[in-house]
Each structure stands twice: as C-alpha cells, then as structure tokens.
Amino acid sequence: AQTMMNLHGVRPGKRILMLGSGNVGLVVSFQLLQCGCEVAALVDAAPRIGGYGVHAAKVARTGVPFYLSHTIVKAEGEDHVTGVTIAQVDEKFQFIPGTEKHFDVDTICLAVGLSPMSQLLKMAGCRMEDNPKKGGQVPVCDSYGETSVPGIFAAGDVSGIEEASSAMIEGRIAGAAAACRLGFITKEELEEASSAYRASLSQLRQGMFAPENRGKLLEKTEEGVDISMNLLRKGYLLDEEVEKYPGVTRRKGIHPVIECSQNIPCNPCQDACAKGCIQVGKKITSLPVVDGEHPCIGCGMCVASCSGQAIFLLNEDYDETSATVTLPWEFLPAPEKGAKGTALGRNGEPVCEAEVLEVKTAKAFDQTRLLTMRIPKEYAMKARFFRAAESGVGA
C-alpha cells in the first residue's frame, strides 16, 4: 500500500482495515487517510500498541478506532475483498466466542511479521544466524557491517529490523568501511567516522523501545512519570492525564503544548526552536520540557517539525470566551479561513464547534500547514483536530 501511494500515486482502496499496530501499521494508516482513504479500524492481536504512542495518537484523533487483542477471523469476497470479520483473542491468542465484529471494507492491509530481507546474502554464501532480537535470519557481521564474505556489507533491514534512523547510520558505517577497504579513506579516518556514528546509534537504541525492552510492559518513563496505559491500549492520552508530562504547560499567551509521553529517540522540536523554549537535553530519548524562561514567539516551527504531530500552540486567552489551538495539517484540501466545523478530541470524538482563523504555509514548514482554530475557552486542553462541516477526515 505504501509503495502504491508514494511511488505510483495509486489509492490502494476506499475503505481499509489495517492489521498491525507497529510503527509501519500506524504510519501507513495515517498515509492512507492523507490519500483520501477511510481507515475502518486498526487491529492487532497483541494487547498493546507496538509502535510509538505519538504515531498512534495522530491516527486516533482523526476518529480511527483501535482494536487490541483482536485479529482477523475471516476475509470475505471472491475476486476482491468485500468485508472482514475480526474477533477478540485471549492470552493464548484463541478466539473468544461472541466477540466477532464485522466491517465492510474493500482492502485489508497487513503490517505484521516483518523479517529481514537477507536472502541475497544467504545465496552469496554469507554465514547466517537465527537472531530473534533482530527479527529472524540475519548475516553474521562484524562491527562495521562486513559479513563473513570479504567485501560484502550488510545494513538496515538486511541485517535486522530496526527504525529507519538506525538503518541509515548502519549504512554510513558500512559505507565508510567499504571506502576504507577500497583505499579511499585511511583506517584512522574510518575509526574517527565510525566512532561518531556508533555513539549516535547507541542513543537511538535507548529508551522505551530499546532492544532490551522488547516485550516488556514499562510503567514509568525515565523521568519517573506514569506511562499511559490508555495510550498503549486505545491509542490516545486521557484528558485527565495529559498535564503530568513535562512538555504540557498552562500559561498566558501563545505557548507550546507537547504531548510526547514516551522515551523515544527524537529531538527535532529542540533543534527547530530558535529561542530555546523547548529542551530535550543531551539524551535524545528524554521527554521534551518547555522552558518558561524562554518565551514562545508563536513561530510554529516546533509544530511543523514534529513527525509525531504531538505539538500544539495554545492561546488560552484569545479573547474573553475563546481560545485558539494551532495544529499540524497534512491533508488536502486544506480548510479556508473562516471555515466552520467541529473540533475533535484526542479520542476522535467531537468536543465543540470550531472556526478556522488561519492556515499558514512556509518553505521552512516542509509542506506541513499550520491550522489555527478558535474554540470555546474551556476546550483548549481537549480539542486536537479539526473536521469541517462536510464529511471525511478534515474535509
């Protein structure tokens, strides 16, 4: 589905059920919504969402329901899908009678069971190993990514399933080693480059989703804050638990609210803020903190830079009765100034009426628009998405 959309400009279907709640399932679900598809449900047999909470939250706030501890019982159709039935499973992954749910869909997307693409290396005679931590059969490599066959290097999904950032750094290490082997750089230059890359790779492999934490249910962040169980099971933070995270602030004037609640390797918000208002610190997995000594100027760079769409600009005192919420907008067509609609909460349910005050674009925003909506003041900490009077995601 991702290839069809991104490379060929083809919509995979009209109404889709996504199986798998890892980062691939979450990100592709959002891309399907951007493509104009309707995502009927996001389903996973696991009891908890497997991907980053911020990616789940940006899907949930559009109204897509999550069904954890559920999987597919039956797909319907002859030459194409016409429907699907799912059911809840117990701790042994057996179907629980009476929990069946039916959806009329024309497409089922599978985002489960990822395994390393290592077949070519096996055919080339590289020594292989079965490594569950890396997702299955992978080549045995040294610290530079070189396999048992001299001159053949492996990185990314060939050597193990990880995030894209880790794959790119592994590729840089392997590329530097290959350049050294061919005489383009010295061993000293290789060591200098690979040392810096390994330091970055080590940081990316820390936090809640570190390899040693796979399969574990963590209850606290590194800062000692309770991890939201509702986020893990339903895809969104509860209104009453949001303010316990250090990026969520209440103050006069425009200010950022950062609903990042998990220790993940991410810090573009810190880099984007020229005023030093947002701090992550030296450890890339730390929760972002809003520094009150550096006032926000409302530029919106942090909102546009967050790939998890977890940052909002609030003005809780826009006027006597209203507040404004500025949120990232990546759907077409974008609402026009003055458009009336409904503000949705974190769970995708309507919370109040809303009016678009501004839709801002800039080259620095990298094609992300900033939509500012006016809402009743009492909903400032609840309204997180805009749906125009017409039906559809943001339409």
Segments predicted by a language model, with ranges:
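Ferredoxin-like iron-sulfur electron-transfer modules
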Residues: 97, 158-159, 243-265, 279-298, ...
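Short, well-ordered loop/turn sites that connect or cap secondary structure elements
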Residues: 334-336
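Short, solvent-exposed secondary-structure boundary/capping segments
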Residues: 361-375
